Amino acid sequence: MKKGTVLNSEISSVISHLGHTDTLVVCDAGLPIPNSTARIDMALTQGVPSFMQVVDVVTREMQVEAAILATEIKQQNPQLHETLLTHLEQLQQHQGNTIKISYTTHEQFKKLTADSQAVIRSGECSPYANVILCAGVTF
């Protein structure tokens, strides 16, 4: 049995195949996922697993150098926005790097997901609970 933190074989595989600057999306239950992008559906029911639970597990194994959010999260979901920023701040301290955070419109965000290696769908049912994580290097 795998000893690492990610037991889901699809997520583990995607993370292990990421190269520098490749992207991985963690999203809420409502984000449309392009047919051209691999979908890893973790949603069991509303809120399970939560967006932050999925982000937490993914970032335990993924080296992150940047994150892209929809600008709308600031106004429409400020509590989750703050929670995510705090998590990313703690992650950069743990990794010993600076994680660049940028924002784009939700419409542009949806277009960017088409270039990601995969989209991991959580059971989150709150607005704009989506992030594009950009892979860094560990050296």
Curated annotation (Swiss-Prot):
Gene3D superfamilies named among the record's database cross-references: RbsD-like domain
Positions contributing to substrate binding: 28, 106, 128-130
InterPro entries: D-ribose_pyranase (IPR023064), RbsD-like_sf (IPR023750), RbsD_FucU (IPR007721)
EC top class named in words: isomerase
Catalytic activity of the protein: beta-D-ribopyranose = beta-D-ribofuranose
EC number(s) stated in the UniProt entry for this protein: 5.4.99.62
Keywords carried by this UniProt record: Carbohydrate metabolism, Cytoplasm, Isomerase
GO molecular function per UniProt: D-ribose pyranase activity; intramolecular lyase activity; monosaccharide binding
Gene Ontology terms describing biological process: D-ribose catabolic process
One Gene Ontology CC term in the entry: cytosol
Role according to the record: Catalyzes the interconversion of beta-pyran and beta-furan forms of D-ribose.
Subunit structure: Homodecamer.
Protein name: D-ribose pyranase
Recorded name of the encoding gene: rbsD
